Amino acid sequence: MKAFSSYDEKPPAPPIRFSSSATRENQVVGLKPLPKEPEATKKKKTMPNPFMKKNKDKKEASEKPVISRPSNFEHTIHVGYDPKTGEFTGMPEAWARLLTDSQISKQEQQQNPQAVLDALKYYTQGESSGQKWLQYDMMFIDDAPSRTPSYGLKPQPYSTSSLPYHGNKIQDPRKMNPMTTSTSSAGYNSKQGVPPTTFSVNENRSSMPPSYAPPPVPHGETPADIVPPAIPDRPARTLSIYTKPKEEEEKIPDLSKGQFGVQARGQKAKKKMTDAEVLTKLRTIVSIGNPDRKYRKVDKIGSGASGSVYTAIEISTEAEVAIKQMNLKDQPKKELIINEILVMRENKHANIVNYLDSYLVCDELWVVMEYLAGGSLTDVVTECQMEDGIIAAVCREVLQALEFLHSRHVIHRDIKSDNILLGMDGSVKLTDFGFCAQLSPEQRKRTTMVGTPYWMAPEVVTRKQYGPKVDVWSLGIMAIEMVEGEPPYLNENPLRAIYLIATNGKPDFPGRDSMTLLFKDFVDSALEVQVENRWSASQLLTHPFLRCAKPLASLYYLIVAAKKSIAEASNS
């Protein structure tokens, strides 16, 4: 690669936003009220049975009573809405407090009371225990929490909004022999019933044409020279969430159908895997051997309550990788670990962060991924003004990943800038598959609410069945994010934001008037409220807006500019 000299003409600096859209201050997130203490109940005295034999009495007295778990229990909900008074009736006290603080006006409540109940149900069902395994507990030693790691790690000199899995030395999986994509290093075993996958979708589409050579790095600069210190993160409410499926919950009365005071019977939840079952399953996935003999750790780039992230070198190839070491005992959703590893291992693509290997070392799981130094798209979005050509290029790369996943009946369900990772060569890759869903022929739709609220499609927020097009909606919101620096409703109360998504559908935003007609049509095609009218990923790849895409190498200068802006803001 030719280095810049003093005689070379450097391109103009990328436009920087006058003020960063990243949140610089810690924001207080309201805590849910604690449940009331159960009232003490007096034990009922039983009359002795005079017909019982004494020896039988002694035997029964020595035995401890066996109490079975409750079955066929009922939870009664009586929530109604009185249009005359404009008030909800029978609403739990905790819900009433949330509604009072939500800034949802009385007029809005009257216009769509069902949307209010849906929003309340979603907000109260969100559980921190359902966060993805890539996200650690929010534990920071310094006063200013890290802005970039969405998994809550305390960053070291380098940080990203998600696990920084990238690398430029990994062979393009579309050029690999389909029968060798799942190698022994990835822990593949023919007895597992998960055969190697082929790549039949868009094999001739290149994510970076040969003419798009990576830009030269200025003389004397390396990616390590431009790594900034960490700055505060986005609000905690932008973290991904998980709520249990509808079939596991108590029903909410559908006010649109005149259902007031519905009695809901609790149904059996899906059986949760035990720790022993998780370990047994992981042993069929991971590689056997000592990872220290294959990889040499270089730098620790993050740490948290249950693990650490390192950059490392594969000894045999000298390729740079990322290794995440996790203590399985500290992972709240161990099943998601298995889900993510299996999905990434069996769905390799040039626009998806590659899973390379995994090992079980005592109680620790080591996951090896490819590593890219560019960080997440969030840094570029919040610090730089992106041209239409750059936005089109990013959207094209993400759509290629989505088209590939959807063709294999996989829904990502958490598309946002935090989960788009960049290489210094301009490569764009999708990561974080902790919430992805595999659809079977028998189950073409999902009802589980997952993802991040501000990027959620209306059918997800309203808890309807949904399919792959929820990813397309999230891509449309991400396109707005690249224009505005943040998604719509980010400054609204979270409960009100959920209500607005369910009620308004396609959001309005200030920068819309300055967009070109082609860009507007592209966003509108992705943000169709009616799912049948919303374009698919394959259809959007044919949209004329993508023809204005600039070379991916142009992203290099935006990445550098964003890092410098973050460093200056941190030092000021």
Curated annotation (Swiss-Prot):
<feature type="domain" description="Protein kinase">
    <location>
        <begin position="295"/>
        <end position="546"/>
    </location>
</feature>
<dbReference type="GO" id="GO:0043204">
    <property type="term" value="C:perikaryon"/>
</dbReference>
<keyword id="KW-0966">Cell projection</keyword>
<dbReference type="GO" id="GO:0005886">
    <property type="term" value="C:plasma membrane"/>
</dbReference>
<dbReference type="Pfam" id="PF00069">
    <property type="entry name" value="Pkinase"/>
</dbReference>
<keyword id="KW-0547">Nucleotide-binding</keyword>
<keyword id="KW-0524">Neurogenesis</keyword>
<dbReference type="GO" id="GO:0010172">
    <property type="term" value="P:embryonic body morphogenesis"/>
</dbReference>
<keyword id="KW-0723">Serine/threonine-protein kinase</keyword>
<keyword id="KW-1003">Cell membrane</keyword>
<dbReference type="InterPro" id="IPR036936">
    <property type="entry name" value="CRIB_dom_sf"/>
</dbReference>
<comment type="function">
    <text>Required for hypodermal cell fusion, together with cdc-42 and ced-10, leading to embryonic body elongation, which involves dramatic cytoskeletal reorganization. Plays a redundant role with max-2 in dorsal axonal guidance in ventral cord commissural motoneurons and in P neuroblast migration. Acts probably downstream of Rho GTPases mig-2 and ced-10 to regulate these 2 processes. Involved in orientating axonal growth of HSN neurons.</text>
</comment>
<dbReference type="InterPro" id="IPR017441">
    <property type="entry name" value="Protein_kinase_ATP_BS"/>
</dbReference>
<dbReference type="GO" id="GO:0004674">
    <property type="term" value="F:protein serine/threonine kinase activity"/>
</dbReference>
<keyword id="KW-0464">Manganese</keyword>
<dbReference type="GO" id="GO:0035262">
    <property type="term" value="P:gonad morphogenesis"/>
</dbReference>
<keyword id="KW-0418">Kinase</keyword>
<dbReference type="InterPro" id="IPR011009">
    <property type="entry name" value="Kinase-like_dom_sf"/>
</dbReference>
<dbReference type="GO" id="GO:0048598">
    <property type="term" value="P:embryonic morphogenesis"/>
</dbReference>
<dbReference type="Pfam" id="PF00786">
    <property type="entry name" value="PBD"/>
</dbReference>
<feature type="compositionally biased region" description="Polar residues">
    <location>
        <begin position="178"/>
        <end position="195"/>
    </location>
</feature>
<dbReference type="GO" id="GO:0043025">
    <property type="term" value="C:neuronal cell body"/>
</dbReference>
<dbReference type="GO" id="GO:0106310">
    <property type="term" value="F:protein serine kinase activity"/>
</dbReference>
<keyword id="KW-0472">Membrane</keyword>
<keyword id="KW-0808">Transferase</keyword>
<dbReference type="GO" id="GO:0016020">
    <property type="term" value="C:membrane"/>
</dbReference>
<feature type="active site" description="Proton acceptor">
    <location>
        <position position="414"/>
    </location>
</feature>
<feature type="region of interest" description="Disordered">
    <location>
        <begin position="156"/>
        <end position="195"/>
    </location>
</feature>
<keyword id="KW-0963">Cytoplasm</keyword>
<dbReference type="InterPro" id="IPR033923">
    <property type="entry name" value="PAK_BD"/>
</dbReference>
<comment type="similarity">
    <text>Belongs to the protein kinase superfamily. STE Ser/Thr protein kinase family. STE20 subfamily.</text>
</comment>
<dbReference type="GO" id="GO:0035556">
    <property type="term" value="P:intracellular signal transduction"/>
</dbReference>
<dbReference type="GO" id="GO:0031581">
    <property type="term" value="P:hemidesmosome assembly"/>
</dbReference>
<dbReference type="InterPro" id="IPR051931">
    <property type="entry name" value="PAK3-like"/>
</dbReference>
<dbReference type="GO" id="GO:0009267">
    <property type="term" value="P:cellular response to starvation"/>
</dbReference>
<protein>
    <recommendedName>
        <fullName>Serine/threonine-protein kinase pak-1</fullName>
        <ecNumber>2.7.11.1</ecNumber>
    </recommendedName>
</protein>
<dbReference type="GO" id="GO:0050770">
    <property type="term" value="P:regulation of axonogenesis"/>
</dbReference>
<feature type="domain" description="CRIB">
    <location>
        <begin position="67"/>
        <end position="80"/>
    </location>
</feature>
<dbReference type="GO" id="GO:0005524">
    <property type="term" value="F:ATP binding"/>
</dbReference>
<keyword id="KW-0217">Developmental protein</keyword>
<comment type="subunit">
    <text>Interacts with cdc-42 (GTP-bound form) and cedd-10 (GTP-bound form).</text>
</comment>
<feature type="region of interest" description="Disordered">
    <location>
        <begin position="1"/>
        <end position="71"/>
    </location>
</feature>
